[in-house]
Amino acid sequence: IMMNRRSSNFMAITLFIISIFAESCVYSKIHGLKVEQDDRKYIALGTFGFLKEGTWEVNMTKFSVTVKPSSEVYRKNYFGFMLLKIARSGVIVDMETSAETCISDGIYMSGHHEVLSMVTFRFDFQENMIHVERSGKAVKNLIISNRYGSGKSEVPKNTETEDVITTLPLQNNNGFYSAYFLVHMMSDAEEGVYKLYFLNCHGPKGTVESSSIDLTVNLVEHNVGNFLSAGEIPIPLLYFVSTAVYLAAALLWAAVLHRYKNDVMKIHYVMLSVVVFTSLACFFHAVNIYYIGKEGLHEEVWAVLYYIAILFQGTLFFITILLLGAGIGFIKHVLSCREKILFAIVIPIQVLDSIALVLVEESEEGQLYYEWSMIAVLVDVFCWIAILCPLVWSIRSRKQDSSTKKLFRQFYLMIVCYVYLTRVVVFLLKNSTPFRYEWLSDLLKEITTAVLFVLMGYKFRPAPYNLYLQVPQESDDTKMDEVITKTGVTDAMESE
């Protein structure tokens, strides 16, 4: 009872945390970033895959720097924006900077010598203007406008080189600066993934010479008829289809449980709840992404429902694998001491890490805690490795030729393959596929999850066809018969 109360309190706290952060999560394409007293040299503002006629609207409503007006910083081009064009979202950029401007003549992809095309927007505080400089053929004719508009069509129609803007106004209001520009991808050659940075190049980070900045910037990314990045456009349909698949699987599993209701155990109902919550999570996610694509902003109610569903789904899925691996309800009814310790440590960590992953995924790239995303991913992998321990212990505790040992080994391979495909292969696929096909990583993850659910349902279906349940019972009965027989023979011999 105490454990149930603690679990309920823990889940209530996590749901409260989700509701608090739901409003700050900004997985949308009309969004903004506000940083204060930040001394990072490069602040990532966004990454987006643009198709032809796509636009990126940048509205800097407030910028200030913590140096005196007479400082040399106001006579140098130390601050500004940098727009990079890359092949795909997963490209790692090597920032090779110079001491003078923080912007080198060439910025390279990690591990390559290919110079990336870029546009720099350097602030000139003396002239109150922004100097626009282009580097690379891919952005040579990129249309940049200073006209305020909806982000869809308020751009010049003439794309001749001589009409390309080279300066933009920089508004000064008592030391607080503001600016606006609109980037328009007019041709097929300009399609691709773009990354936007803010540059703070006044002295090395953390030194006396460095300057902290306050920055508020609003961004609107838009493709024709859609606010989603090119690789995200098919995602709503993908998750609607996944919803139908998981719902069908849940109905099928419910029918199996009803048919063999005399042999059903509690773990079977937990498995059903996992599939149901997976279906709900896919549905809420699909609706949320659909509204983002249509309106540019997520509907808060669908976002919160998605966070709650994915939290319950992840927690129940994790617990299910732990219980199946330990054999609870099948080959034993009580956890061992080391299994209790493992459960008490890993499950809360996994729940908190799931929350962290959701918050990081929904946060702005430029927010400080976004940089901790890799730690959350590593913790997730650690938790999945940890849940293999009960499986290994169960395998070692079985007889060499027992059917249960064979089934444990199969389950072990299933989990290893699932973790490898959804944590490693999905990551590699997302960071290596062309920007139009980034949705393939989501497809692979959903297919892998669906296959695992089917295999788990088949392997651990209710008796009398479940070897996992059937064999240990026979083994226990045999042992009991041997004990009774030996005891009876011994008693008879002693009486004689």
Give the ranges of each region predicted by the language model.
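Hydrophobic alpha-helical transmembrane segments corresponding to the first two to three helices
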Residues: 209-351
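Structural signal for hydrophobic/aromatic residues that build the beta-strand cores
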Residues: 58, 194-198, 254, 325, ...
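Soluble extramembrane domains flanking the early transmembrane region of eukaryotic membrane proteins
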Residues: 4-233
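Residue-level marker of positions within ordered structural domains that often coincide
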Residues: 63, 201, 259, 330, ...
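Sequence-level detector for tyrosine residue identity
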Residues: 27, 42, 74, 78, ...
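Generic detector of multi-pass transmembrane helix bundles and their immediately adjacent loops
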Residues: 297-496
